[in-house]
Structure formats: structure tokens, C-alpha cells
């Protein structure tokens, strides 16, 4: 899910917003690189010949931080994402102190939405600010159209996931509950 460099892998967006790094190993040699620097281009990584991912390091986050991951696909189970988003924001005194946002399926590699993050940080935690972030996402990605989704759909989904995150955190009792009829 990480080493094959698929742009629609589910784990990389989450690991990116958590500032995870990968420990790469070849024989006895090891090196550590941030996951957001691991991907170079479509299906290309910084992995050298005979090197492999030995481990993933995730910094500890403080209790109470709310991270959300969303997978959007045509089918409920066993499907490859049309888009996958991971969002983690921290607030202080009613303002967004830190925004970490990443998407898969929005470009040739999974990546952070850096323009969106910058547009949100320091502003009030409200729907108007989130809508500014939704517009800023347009500057982060140039999605493609393929058999899973159109580029317009992918862009709209990424914007809607930001708004969904805001509403879920503002109204925790409204969080959806999914009940499956199987184990």
C-alpha cells in the first residue's frame, strides 16, 4: 500500500498528515525519510535498488486530537478509492492553529494539500473559513478522469470532505453510524 506508490492507496494520506516517516533498509544500511518526500512521481519512489521499507514511524499525537480519514469508492467493500482524504486540524482560541490535509486519487502521487493548509491556518474555525480552504484545494491538485471518477468529481469530493470534517467535529452527535449485517 505504501511501497508500490499507487496514487490511490488508502494509507499514505493518513500517514502523511501524521508526519510519519519510513525507515528504508538495504543490508545493514538504514535511512529515514518523511513519507511526503517518499513519492517522486507516478509509481516512482526514492527507494533504491534492493532497498525496502523496514518500518514506519509515527510521532505520538496528543490526546484529544481528532483525525478523520475518508475513502470514497463506488462499492462499499473491497474497492479501490476514487479519492481518499485524511484531515487533522487543531484549534486554539477559536482559530485553526494547524491544518494537515492529504488526499490520494487527486494527482499522480498521494500528497498534502499545502495551499489549503496555509489558507486555513490562523483563521477562525467556522464554515466560512472551511469554504476558503475548499477553494484553495483547487490550487493543490489537478486530478485526472479515469474509469473510477471524473476530475470534476474528485475535486468536488475533496472539497466536500473538508466541509464534512468541519460538520462532524462541530456536531459529534450527528456522526454517522454504519451497521453491517455480516462479520
Task: Give residue ranges: language-model regions.
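C-terminal structural segment of proteins
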Residues: 1-183
Amino acid at each position: 500500500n505504501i511501497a508500490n506508490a499507487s496514487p490511490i492507496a488508502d494509507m499514505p494520506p493518513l500517514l502523511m498528515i501524521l508526519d510519519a516517516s519510513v525507515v528504508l533498509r538495504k543490508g545493514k544500511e538504514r535511512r529515514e525519510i518523511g513519507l511526503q518526500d517518499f513519492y517522486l512521481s507516478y509509481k516512482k519512489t526514492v527507494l533504491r535498488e534492493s532497498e525496502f521499507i523496514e518500518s514506519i514511524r509515527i510521532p505520538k499525537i496528543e490526546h484529544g486530537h481528532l483525525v478523520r480519514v475518508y475513502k470514497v469508492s463506488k462499492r462499499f467493500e473491497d474497492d479501490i478509492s476514487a479519492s481518499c482524504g485524511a484531515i487533522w486540524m487543531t484549534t486554539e482560541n477559536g482559530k485553526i492553529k494547524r491544518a494537515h490535509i492529504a488526499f490520494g486519487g487527486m494527482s499522480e502521487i498521494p500528497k498534502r494539500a499545502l495551499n489549503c493548509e496555509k489558507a486555513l491556518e490562523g483563521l477562525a474555525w467556522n464554515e466560512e473559513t472551511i469554504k476558503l480552504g475548499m477553494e484553495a484545494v483547487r490550487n493543490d491538485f489537478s486530478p485526472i478522469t479515469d474509469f473510477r471518477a471524473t476530475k470534476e468529481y474528485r475535486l468536488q469530493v475533496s472539497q466536500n470532505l473538508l466541509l464534512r470534517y468541519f460538520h462532524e467535529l462541530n456536531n459529534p452527535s450527528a456522526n454517522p453510524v454504519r451497521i453491517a449485517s455480516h462479520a
